[in-house]
A protein has these predicted regions:
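Extracellular/lumen-exposed scaffold segments
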Residues: 2-4, 13-137
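Sec-dependent N-terminal signal peptides
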Residues: 6-8
Length: 137
């Protein structure tokens, strides 16, 4: 009888530990779309795109691209909170924090559905997201 009680208590304890957060490894890395929030709108002949970059994260300036089909479309930086960063993989590079805003001339781009925005960023803790691709509209 004593052995049965020990077995039942051990089983119960094992089940408790297995279901507790102690053994569960939950990801603490948020999705890219939650830390690099992209929005866009059309204002006359300009397309304006902005990123809200959450605290503790940054974008690589040189990763930001606007493309239509395979062609890179030039853009103008309206606002950026840039700084120089020494990256172990990319060397000295410009990064963006907080807000980043660009404008794209819309005079020749009538079909906005084919425009893609590409960007890549990392967390201050060292996790880097793969290149992100988002349709403009």
């Amino acid at each position: 009888m004593r052995q049965l009680i020990i077995i039942l208590l051990s089983t119960n304890l094992s089940l408790e530990l297995a279901s507790s957060e102690f053994l569960e490894k939950k990801s603490t890395i948020p999705e890219a779309k939650k830390v690099f929030i992209v929005s866009s709108y059309v204002d006359k002949n300009l397309i304006k795109v902005s990123w809200e970059i959450k605290d503790g994260f940054y974008l690589y300036l040189n990763s930001v691209q606007v493309k239509k089909n395979a062609n890179i479309i030039p853009y103008t930086v309206i606002y950026s909170d840039q700084s120089t960063y020494s990256d172990e993989f990319f060397g000295t590079t410009k990064i963006l924090r907080k807000d980043f805003k660009i404008s794209i001339n819309n005079s020749d781009l009538l079909d906005l559905s084919n425009i893609l925005i590409k960007y890549q960023g990392c967390s201050d803790s060292g996790f880097c997201y793969p290149m992100q691709t988002k349709k403009l509209l």
